């Protein structure tokens, strides 16, 4: 799948610590491909996970700050594909951002309604 360079440049430009970038769109439109292509050029320690993975759901739906921080570890970038599958994802991403000021986060979702509902308040 072709990924326009402009999309990669935009992601690079807006990726900042203490912010969450949400990439959403219909299934099979290229969100995961965009992320994989983006990650090829990133010079950060990153963790790429899927919200469909039950272990990931267990960690990222937890409201334990200690559990969330241990999951992210020393990574500088957390990338969550299918984030809408994780309960309380919005509140928990906010906890990560509030307690790990240097971490950058990208979340994707195929259902903007479900993702928006689970994100709750703007981050």
Give a label for each model feature.
Residues 1-123:
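Phosphate-binding site recognition
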